[in-house]
Amino acid sequence: MRFGRLLLLAVLLAGVSQLPAVSGRKKGEKPGGCPPDDGPCLLSVPDQCTDDSQCPSTMKCCPRACFRQCIPRVSVKLGSCPVDQLHCLSPTKHLCHQDSNCSGKKRCCPTACGRDCRDPVKE
């Protein structure tokens, strides 16, 4: 009887391990996000990676101006940045560079004139 229970437990655990991750990440995608890239494409070079699995431990495969590259990941807060419907008349400097620069739940979001800390919208 005890062997039967152990076998049932093993089968259940094996099945659960095959379920997709609840986090919504794609298979092989590492946690965290990519830092923003503001640079223009100065030199077109081949992609250095196609996905996170090709990057060392804490690095992610991130899009740059005109190619993909393994770079250190940054922490990303929950929610999405709101869409900015405005047009910029006078560009300003960025008020943040990544989510960790923003207080509380605010995210560092692109706006018409630069990056700024904004309240996220629910996904």
From Swiss-Prot:
Disulfide bonds join C34-C62, C41-C66, C49-C61, C55-C70, C81-C109, C88-C113, C96-C108, C102-C117. GO terms for cellular component: extracellular region. Pfam families: WAP. The gene is WFDC5. Residues 27-74, 75-121 form the WAP domain. InterPro entries: Elafin-like_sf (IPR036645), WAP_dom (IPR008197). Keywords: Disulfide bond, Protease inhibitor, Repeat, Secreted, Serine protease inhibitor, Signal. One of its GO terms (molecular function) is serine-type endopeptidase inhibitor activity. Putative acid-stable proteinase inhibitor. PANTHER family: WAP FOUR-DISULFIDE CORE DOMAIN PROTEIN 8. This is WAP four-disulfide core domain protein 5. Residues 1-24 form the signal peptide.
